[in-house]
Amino acid sequence: MEDEGFVDDDFIDDTAREFVGRYGIASLAVLREHAAIAEAAGDYLLAQMWREVVEAAERMLT
């Protein structure tokens, strides 16, 4: 994601780790909801960031 130039990988991983630590497997649903809310509000960059966090959380949980 760092290549795209808007949020660095450490932030994505740290955020995913925080959600996984707090919510466990349920973090995926919580994070997907954040992405959906951002997209519904028209904030596509924020929605993309949340989707990246979902992917990082999925990697941590597998």
Explain the meaning of each model-derived region.
Residues 1-41, 45, 52, 59-62:
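Long, non-catalytic architectural segments outside compact domain cores
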